[in-house]
Every structure is written in structure tokens, then in C-alpha cells.
Design a protein with these regions (language model features):
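Phosphate- and other anionic-substrate recognition elements at nucleic-acid/protein interfaces
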Residues: 1-155, 159-165
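Short alpha-helical scaffolding segments that buttress acidic/His motifs in well-ordered protein cores
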Residues: 105, 192, 206, 253-258, ...
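Short helix-capping/linker segments at secondary-structure and domain boundaries
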Residues: 109-114, 211-215, 261-267, 294-308
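Helix-hairpin-helix/helix-loop-helix acidic hairpins
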Residues: 145-201, 210, 265
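Phosphate-backbone recognition surface of nucleic-acid-processing proteins
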Residues: 200, 204-281, 317-318
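Low-complexity, acidic/Ser/Thr- and charged residue-rich accessory regions of DNA metabolism proteins
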Residues: 235-236, 240, 271-321
């Protein structure tokens, strides 16, 4: 496939771009003017795919600008690109070289194009991100409170904890209002809440962390969450399966659902107990998390509420994990 690819190495202030030959190469500012130049370069050179490296959020503006202009753009993990460079023998590293390597990676692997979500879904994702930041800051303050030894510090820390609690309540209210103002998000939330052990708060987190829910198959959604089992085999050696990467905060939410489900969800309780007969506890929990996610994905895809009979039927049909 001779797809013409442009790689972009994203920095805080600048964007370095290159095609796989290095003939189309340069630097623009990471702002509106720079985006216009990039779009002109894409048009003049008949670029079919633009590939960006994830860069701690600095890539978001150019990503949304290109996707909003119907340009096919993909975002990839820096680790994968760096491993690709090493495999190709490209050990030197500069911004221009990185842009060319990203283009070559895109040409070889044809990454899945970014799907532009609705404005409200993007807002929900950003509110979810801010919520995580506040929780992290509150945990840090509580740790400081435990080792505080003077009255002034203790008083200051308690004020900060109170502030974070108020901000979290405000963020939760904003997320709820956003969901209720969007018919699709509200309907999805109601479908998720039909599952025993998923309440409004958990549904809110799942919607924020996984807007792709319902648009992928079961293997893709498990991989997205980092719940797809990885093999570690070689010759006669067969290692334990493991999970890695993926969306940590989505996994955290699913973990709490599975733990709560031991009391409130008959399907999860039965599945966990059956798996526990042959597998360690954590392995059984992860397997339940993966199965739960695929069930939720199917519910959103098929526009159906939780059905215990259907879930148990799937469990019987897939008795061997």
C-alpha cells in the first residue's frame, strides 16, 4: 500500500513534520498559524494519512484541528515508534529524525485513524481528567496530613482537602449535567446503570474514559482497556499470561464493579467463584473485568439493557477461558 504519510513530532511550541523520504520536511509553530501551514502542506503533497506521537496533551490541538477538517490522522504511542526506529537501526534522535521515523512507522503499520467524538463527549473526557487530577492532589494532601506535626500545617492541609472536596462535588455536578443534556450520553448512562453494581458515579467514569464503547469488537475493547491477555511462550516454556498498558482509570472502575459485584451482581459472583476454582484470585478478577467490559460493549452496541439470562448464557457457551 503506497499511502502518502506525513509524520509530525509534537513539541510544546513547535511541530516538526516529514514524509518518509525527507523531501517534505520542516517546522511550524504549534498554534493556529502552524496548523494552517500543515494543512496547506498536506493538500499540496496529496498526503493521505497524518501520524502524530502522543505527547502529554500537546498533540490535542493539532489532532482536533486536523480531524475537524476531515483529514485522516492517527495518534500512536511513543514507545512503539521508538522500538520501530531501533528495529530499523535508526539510533540517532532529533526532532526532524523523529518526524521522519513517525512517518515511516505510519507507512509500515497503517495505524487506526482517530475518530472525532462529539463536543460533549470531549468535554466529558476533559472533566474526567480534571477529576482524576483533583483526586490525586487530595490523596497527596491526606498523606501530608498524616505526617504533619504542627497546628498551622495541619490547618492549611485541612483547608486544602476541603477545597478539593468542594471542587470534586462541582466537577461531578458538571459531569452529570453534561450527561443529562445529551440524549445519547444519557441513554448510554441508563444502559450502563441497568447492570447491577454499576451506579451513576461508575457509569460517569466509564463514559468519560471510554467514549469508544459500543464501536469496537470484544478483542479491540479489551485491548483498549489493557485487559487482553498477553502470551509469554518460547519453545517448551509456557509462561503466565499477563496484561499491560491500556486505560488504567477504566480498569480501576471495572475492578470496583467486579468487587462490588460479589454482593450485588449474581452473574459476576458466579463467574468469579467458578474461575476461582482453578485460577488465582487476581487472575479471576481480571477475567471478570474483561468479560464485564465485553458485555457492556455489546449492550451499548445493541442498545439493550443488562440481561442476567443472556450473560449466564454467554458464560455457559464460553466455559473454557
Amino acid at each position: 500500500m503506497n499511502t502518502k504519510v506525513l509524520g509530525i513530532d509534537v513539541g510544546k511550541r513547535e511541530l516538526y513534520y516529514s514524509d518518509i523520504t525527507g523531501n517534505v520536511q520542516g517546522k511550524v509553530a504549534n498554534d493556529g498559524r502552524g496548523f494552517k501551514k500543515i494543512k496547506r502542506i498536506i493538500s499540496e503533497n496529496n498526503i493521505e494519512l497524518v501520524v502524530l506521537e502522543a505527547s502529554g496533551g500537546y498533540e490535542q490541538k493539532v489532532l482536533l484541528d486536523l480531524a475537524g477538517n476531515k483529514i485522516k490522522v492517527a495518534i500512536v504511542e511513543p514507545t512503539r515508534v521508538r522500538n520501530h526506529a531501533r528495529a530499523a537501526g535508526q539510533l540517532a534522535k532529533t526532532d526532524r529524525i523523529d518526524a521522519k521515523v513517525i512517518a515511516h512507522f505510519g507507512f509500515c503499520h497503517q495505524p487506526r485513524p482517530f475518530v472525532l467524538q462529539s463536543e460533549r463527549k470531549r468535554q466529558l473526557r476533559q472533566l474526567g481528567k480534571r477529576r482524576r487530577q483533583l483526586i490525586r492532589n487530595r490523596v497527596q494532601e491526606k498523606c501530608r496530613l498524616e505526617e504533619s506535626s504542627d497546628g498551622f500545617s495541619t490547618s492549611s492541609i485541612n483547608r486544602m482537602i476541603g477545597f478539593f472536596d468542594e471542587e470534586l462535588e462541582r466537577i461531578d455536578a458538571l459531569m452529570d449535567a453534561l450527561i443529562e443534556s445529551d440524549r445519547e450520553l444519557l441513554h448510554r448512562s441508563e444502559l450502563l446503570e441497568s447492570c447491577p453494581s454499576i451506579g451513576r458515579g461508575t457509569a460517569r467514569v466509564i463514559l468519560a474514559e471510554c467514549p469508544e464503547l459500543g464501536s469496537m469488537n470484544r478483542k479491540q475493547i479489551a485491548s483498549l482497556a489493557g485487559l487482553a491477555p498477553m502470551n509469554r511462550d518460547s519453545g517448551d516454556y509456557q509462561g503466565s499470561r499477563y496484561i499491560q498498558r491500556g486505560r488504567k482509570h477504566l480498569r480501576n472502575a471495572l475492578y470496583m464493579v467486579v468487587v462490588s459485584g460479589q454482593r450485588h451482581n449474581v452473574y459476576l459472583k458466579e463467574r468469579y467463584e467458578r474461575l476461582r476454582e482453578t485460577k488465582p484470585g487476581k487472575v479471576a478478577i481480571v477475567a471478570c473485568m474483561r468479560k464485564l467490559l465485553t458485555q457492556l460493549n455489546a449492550m451499548i452496541r445493541d442498545d439493550t439493557c443488562w440481561s442476567l439470562d443472556k450473560a449466564q448464557g454467554d458464560m455457559a457457551a464460553n466455559a473454557v477461558i
